[in-house]
Amino acid sequence: MKSRPQEFQEDFYIPIPLDTNNITALSPFLVPQDHLGGSGIFMIMTVFMLFLFIGGTSINVLTIVCTVQYKKLRSHLNYILVNLAISNLLVSTVGSFTAFVSFLNRYFIFGPTACKIEGFVATLGGMVSLWSLSVVAFERWLVICKPVGNFSFKGTHAIIGCALTWFFALLASTPPLFGWSRYIPEGLQCSCGPDWYTTENKYNNESYVMFLFCFCFGFPFTVILFCYGQLLFTLKSAAKAQADSASTQKAEREVTKMVVVMVMGFLVCWLPYASFALWVVFNRGQSFDLRLGTIPSCFSKASTVYNPVIYVFMNKQFRSCMMKLIFCGKSPFGDDEEASSSSQVTQVSSVGPEK
């Protein structure tokens, strides 16, 4: 049966040919989207989103509580990690939970207004998380590489860094609320995000996608690569100068490993969205498998779980305090880990060039 042209809808868009000219009857706000996938794929996504909701909420609440509980964790450089936890919490409690309920029902049961709210909040949280990763890199470059001499990193600088992540995130996430792009159901139509699909219409989605690619992917990724590249260069120079120092050699290996993991974590989270959005812009009008359109959203929401693992659990001092909190004051790793962490942090922080 030949597919018919689709009518344009203000609140949703299904980018595949359908055997009906009454697309309103298949609205993702009204009926289960069984025409897009079998019950198995919806059940898999339901379980996955439930895992992200429980895991993301638990680990980020634990990060915040642990920081409040232990004074030693309330250093200026850790402010941005708490900021990251707050943004992740926003995504997991709003984005992942809403997606879980919707996948369970196989359509977005909350309606078009809630879709716009969920899309905005999840995008805002995701953007804050994204910018937090670049601020983490910038702050470490500032403290370790000392590009401005013996710069003293204070609480004011940390707060400014956190505030900038929210400012940039609002700059990127609010335009769809005012007509530059729009928030609609994406992928299997059970979660909402910016409109990556439609082209050549009043929403100017192509220009918005290019704006996001440059401002929210290209620029932060450049900052991360530059800062971590400089950091590794500084550590390698220090390691050569102190070839007999086992602690310096160990610090270099540990930081190199962490940098690689951090860069890969950023790419895993945001490269699928960036690639998918660009593909849509440069292949206008082509249909695609909606299950593939769901993948970028899955990766970005999954970052609420794996980013804390990278940035918090790979921090030995943070991990030690977290284990003490979980095990009622007794860390199963003992106190040696915390001591070695302090020693290593001191070693790494002092390798920058003198000005």
From Swiss-Prot:
Extracellular side: 1-41, 105-118, 182-207, 282-289
Sequence positions bearing N6-(retinylidene)lysine: 301
One Gene Ontology cellular component annotation held by this UniProt entry: membrane
Annotated stretches, region: Disordered: 334-355
Subcellular location: Membrane
Biased composition (Low complexity): 340-355
Transmembrane segments: 42-66, 79-104, 119-138, 158-181, 208-235, 258-281, 290-314
Keyword set, alphabetical order: Chromophore, Disulfide bond, G-protein coupled receptor, Glycoprotein, Membrane, Phosphoprotein, Photoreceptor protein, Receptor, Retinal protein, Sensory transduction, Transducer, Transmembrane, Transmembrane helix, Vision
Tissue: The color pigments are found in the cone photoreceptor cells.
PTM summary: Phosphorylated on some or all of the serine and threonine residues present in the C-terminal region.
An annotated Gene Ontology molecular function: photoreceptor activity
Pfam families: 7tm_1 (PF00001)
Top-level taxon of origin: Eukaryota
Residue spans, topological domain Cytoplasmic: 67-78, 139-157, 236-257, 315-355
UniProt similarity note: Belongs to the G-protein coupled receptor 1 family. Opsin subfamily.
Protein name as it appears in the record: Blue-sensitive opsin
Species lineage: Eukaryota, Metazoa, Chordata, Craniata, Vertebrata
